[in-house]
Amino acid sequence: FEDDFVWQGDDYRVKREEARTALIAVAEACLGRKLQDDPLIVGTSGRYEFRNKGLDVLLEGMKRLAGLERLDREVVLYVMVPAANRGARADLQKHLQDPSQPIDGSQWPWATHYLENMQWDPIVRAIDGSPLADPASKVHVIFVPSYLDDRDGIFDKSYYELLVGMDLTLFPSYYEPWGYTPLESIAFSVPTVTTTLAGFGLWIDRRE
């Protein structure tokens, strides 16, 4: 990474605050309600390889977490994995610009974009009918099936401009030659969890 890859000082604090504000606003719009103060914002990203990237394990872990009786803090997991979609949800766009605009109740609430072939989507199928779909749950998943390149239509920020607002990232890969995403997370001072089945995780493990 270049020396100026990560914001420093006041610039970092401003970017983090802006990112958290955006992440919370989008989650609340999708869920149709306010979150508790200071939710734990968790993220994962990468190619849409449901098993190889460990998305199956991650979502199963979130289901178990949602089943805990005593969970003091709300958790929002952002799954930022590009997938076939037909653009940003118009109702979310309007609501984010003007909160008096209603959310379309006919839309699948946990995605920011119109998904193609929803009935076959592994993330959709993992959430539907699970504790993660319970409105009373304190654990929420928001699926962002778009490249984050400043023009996704919902955030209109880059991936790094959102990464900086997270409290934790999770990359439970089954296999990864190296894996840049945990390294990027650390670069932005966001704690990360990965596996020793990924090159970066194995390298860290051997240095301990």
Place the predicted regions along the sequence by residue.
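Catalytic cores of carbohydrate-active enzymes across secretory and cytosolic contexts
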Residues: F1-E208
